[in-house]
Amino acid sequence: MSERLIQLAANLKKVLGKRIQSVEIALGEVTVVVYADTYFESAMLMRDDPSLAFEQLIDLCGVDYQDFRDGAWAGQRFGVVSHLLSLEHNWRLRVRVFAPDDSYPLVASVSPVWNSANWFEREAFDLYGILFDGHDDLRRILTDYGFIGHPFRKDFPISGNVEMRYDPELKRVIYQPVTIEAREITPRIVREEQYGGPV
């Protein structure tokens, strides 16, 4: 295990203290899980404390842990995972926070801490339905305005609920219930003497 990773984990424990739920070093990476009620405060400390200096948020995404590891997941269903970079110390860090209520997933927004989180949080809201408290423009970013549901949730129907198509008679786009027709696909058989052989 790298001394640098051990030092990073020690610095995290020292700076964040009881805000940390767990710290893990695995596969050459440090992952810290913070409590939802201390998420924003922890983000400020990780950015501003000179022993950490994570001045850049590289990525933020939502995760639906329903049926994770074949249903063996016992924790909260929705999580937010961020990847941070410290240019000063050349450290990378994965930060994970879980929404305490599965029926109303809500965590603090870190877009006031790192501006780059703005669109990432909108994407997590759009695709997973995770709400970010304090986000100043939380609206859909990838799906259509009239879209119902959140398509990356594991309980979202694979076929969707409605389909959109252009109606040439009305000369506009319309929505209609999904129509799926069962069809049988017959594989094509290739019969060539030289198929797969030397050229």
From Swiss-Prot:
Cross-referenced PROSITE patterns: COMPLEX1_30K
Catalytic activity from the UniProt record: a quinone + NADH + 5 H(+)(in) = a quinol + NAD(+) + 4 H(+)(out)
Membrane topology: Peripheral membrane protein
Gene Ontology CC: one annotated term: plasma membrane
Enzyme class: translocase
Compartments where located: Cell inner membrane
Broad class of the protein's primary localization: membrane
Gene Ontology terms, MF aspect: NADH dehydrogenase (ubiquinone) activity; NADH:ubiquinone reductase (non-electrogenic) activity; quinone binding
Listed EC numbers: 7.1.1.-
Subunit architecture: NDH-1 is composed of 14 different subunits. Subunits NuoB, C, D, E, F, and G constitute the peripheral sector of the complex.
Protein name as it appears in the record: NADH-quinone oxidoreductase subunit C
Organism lineage string: Bacteria, Pseudomonadati, Pseudomonadota, Betaproteobacteria, Burkholderiales
Membership in a protein family: Belongs to the complex I 30 kDa subunit family.
Keywords: Cell inner membrane, Cell membrane, Membrane, NAD, Quinone, Translocase, Transport, Ubiquinone
Function: NDH-1 shuttles electrons from NADH, via FMN and iron-sulfur (Fe-S) centers, to quinones in the respiratory chain. The immediate electron acceptor for the enzyme in this species is believed to be ubiquinone. Couples the redox reaction to proton translocation (for every two electrons transferred, four hydrogen ions are translocated across the cytoplasmic membrane), and thus conserves the redox energy in a proton gradient.
Residues annotated as signal peptide: none
Protein's gene: nuoC
